[in-house]
Structures are given as structure tokens and as C-alpha cells.
């Protein structure tokens, strides 16, 4: 593994461990960002199941013309995820940024999820 991959993996582990300490049974909103798309899901770690998910690859997102590589798409994914989570009865989550900086697309997704009904 390259030094950069090792550093990112360690950062991801460190963030996950701190989230596990403060979660208190709340589901985790996990975000994955690639160069072309963004993915988010609400995970119940106690049961090991995904409660809601959304990504920029979905048909609803592709029809709007947004690629996943911009802030507008991240906002749309955050809003869609929050609507699905609230529909399934989840309102409080712990935000897992996955080692990414809280900036740009990650911040836009989090803000849109908050505006649509999730609290973290």
C-alpha cells in the first residue's frame, strides 16, 4: 500500500472509533465520495443493516443532469437520503464523514440532510 492509502485508512479507522464511542445506539450516516459520484447511507450498526441509501447514480439523479462530482448533486443526494430515512422512522443519526474533510461536497450533503429532517 502506498503511504497515502495507509494514512487515509488510519484516519478512517480513527473517525469510526470515535463515532462508535459517541453513537449511543443511533444509526450512522456514512458518506463515500469518488471522483465522479457520491454515495450516502444510514446504517444501523447494532443490527448490521442499511436503513436508507441514496447516491448520484440513481435514475432520479441522472434525469436532473447532475453528475455526482459537484456540490449540487451532493445536496440532492443529502435531501433524498434524509427523506428516505425520515420515512423509515430515523430522525437522529451520527455523521460519519469517513475520513474526508468536512468541506465541499461532504458539507453540502450534510447541510441538505439537516435541512430535510435529520439531526446530528
From Swiss-Prot:
Pfam families: Ribosomal_L18p (PF00861). GO terms for cellular component: cytosolic large ribosomal subunit. GO terms for molecular function: 5S rRNA binding; structural constituent of ribosome. GO terms for biological process: translation. Coiled coil: none annotated. HAMAP family: Ribosomal_uL18_B. This is Large ribosomal subunit protein uL18. It comes from Rhodopseudomonas palustris (strain BisB18). The gene is rplR.
Amino acid at each position: 500500500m502506498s503511504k497515502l492509502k495507509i494514512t487515509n485508512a488510519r484516519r478512517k479507522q480513527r473517525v469510526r472509533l470515535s463515532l462508535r464511542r459517541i453513537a449511543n445506539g443511533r444509526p450512522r450516516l456514512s458518506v463515500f465520495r469518488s471522483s465522479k459520484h457520491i454515495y450516502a447511507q444510514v446504517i444501523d450498526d447494532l443490527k448490521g443493516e442499511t436503513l436508507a441509501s441514496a447516491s448520484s447514480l440513481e435514475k432520479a439523479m441522472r434525469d436532473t443532469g447532475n453528475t455526482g462530482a459537484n456540490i449540487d448533486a451532493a445536496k440532492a443526494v443529502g435531501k433524498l437520503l434524509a427523506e428516505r430515512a425520515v420515512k423509515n422512522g430515523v430522525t437522529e443519526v451520527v455523521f460519519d464523514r469517513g475520513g474526508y474533510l468536512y468541506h465541499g461536497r461532504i458539507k453540502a450533503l450534510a447541510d441538505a440532510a439537516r435541512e430535510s429532517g435529520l439531526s446530528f
